[in-house]
Amino acid sequence: MESIFHEKQEGSLCAQHCLNNLLQGEYFSPVELSSIAHQLDEEERMRMAEGGVTSEDYRTFLQQPSGNMDDSGFFSIQVISNALKVWGLELILFNSPEYQRLRIDPINERSFICNYKEHWFTVRKLGKQWFNLNSLLTGPELISDTYLALFLAQLQQEGYSIFVVKGDLPDCEADQLLQMIRVQQMHRPKLIGEELAQLKEQRVHKTDLERVLEANDGSGMLDEDEEDLQRALALSRQEIDMEDEEADLRRAIQLSMQGSSRNISQDMTQTSGTNLTSEELRKRREAYFEKQQQKQQQQQQQQQQGDLSGQSSHPCERPATSSGALGSDLGDAMSEEDMLQAAVTMSLETVRNDLKTEGKK
């Protein structure tokens, strides 16, 4: 199918597309067809002038526009016919009595030119298969042999004029290639207008879909951005809270250290105050020691008296030691322990008294 030459519609140049698709190449241009149209106009003018240039018919003919071409690109059947004569080709009306009497099967022909109003297109046999080369189609349309007659009959019912092309067409690559192979067409080509409408509809649908997707993507991005922002704010708050807690902890430690230093200084002050009354403390200790010694001496005397009364009752028993030595040893032993205990006790009492005095202040 790629080897088949197929010109698509441009403007109203369907006559040009029809001829080039028939001949399978860029054989004619609008300028060449316009030149043929001007020649036909001049031939018609000369025939009209034969009746007199002053006649009413001649003046009317000159005032009328050309019947062989117009500014849109339309060309008449006469222009097409004269263009084909250059290649030795002739056009015969398909439904004319002369052709119908020949009873030729359409599949035995080589090509047809179809016209409806101002549109022209070609149906041609390439190799062993028929193709509709209408320039309004997006590509060549394969026509089976059995469908060809029905296709032509349908065109006639729709008002088309069908012309049979007689003569030898120029050789072309597509004809040579399709002589050896047959092609299959899975999808029929669409009309250019239908394809453009479909493409436009697809573009509109795609645009709408893209807008929806962009809107969704945008909202999704906004949602993601909001989530990221919330996450960042939460982390920031956590960091601030942690910083506040750390600051509070540092502040508490600092205050604790300051309090400890104050307590230490107060203790040092109290200790220094205690040192100032050490003489008084020494006197208290001596008085306490003397009181304890007096108690111990009284206890020793009472014990000696008990021993003497016992000796008078038992004259055979002798004391192991003298009472003076025993009292001295006990006094010495008691004095060392009691002195240590008394010192500790008095120190504690002194500290308590100082604390009470400080508290009252």
Curated annotation (Swiss-Prot):
The keyword Nucleotide-binding does not apply. It is found in: Nucleus matrix; Nucleus; Lysosome membrane. It catalyses: Thiol-dependent hydrolysis of ester, thioester, amide, peptide and isopeptide bonds formed by the C-terminal Gly of ubiquitin (a 76-residue protein attached to proteins as an intracellular targeting signal). Residues 258-278, 306-325 have a biased composition (Polar residues). Keywords: Hydrolase, Isopeptide bond, Lysosome, Membrane, Neurodegeneration, Nucleus, Phosphoprotein, Protease, Repeat, Spinocerebellar ataxia, Thiol protease, Transcription, Transcription regulation, Ubl conjugation, Ubl conjugation pathway. Monoubiquitinated N-terminally by UBE2W, possibly leading to activate the deubiquitinating enzyme activity. Changing C14A: Loss of deubiquitination activity. GO terms for molecular function: ATPase binding; cysteine-type deubiquitinase activity; identical protein binding; K48-linked deubiquitinase activity; K63-linked deubiquitinase activity; ubiquitin protein ligase binding. Ubiquitous. It is an enzyme of class 3 (hydrolase). One of its GO terms (biological process) is negative regulation of TORC1 signaling. One of its GO terms (cellular component) is cytoplasm. It is a peripheral membrane protein. The UIM domains bind ubiquitin and interact with various E3 ubiquitin-protein ligase, such as STUB1/CHIP. They are essential to limit the length of ubiquitin chains. Deubiquitinating enzyme involved in protein homeostasis maintenance, transcription, cytoskeleton regulation, myogenesis and degradation of misfolded chaperone substrates. Binds long polyubiquitin chains and trims them, while it has weak or no activity against chains of 4 or less ubiquitins. Involved in degradation of misfolded chaperone substrates via its interaction with STUB1/CHIP: recruited to monoubiquitinated STUB1/CHIP, and restricts the length of ubiquitin chain attached to STUB1/CHIP substrates and preventing further chain extension. This is Ataxin-3.
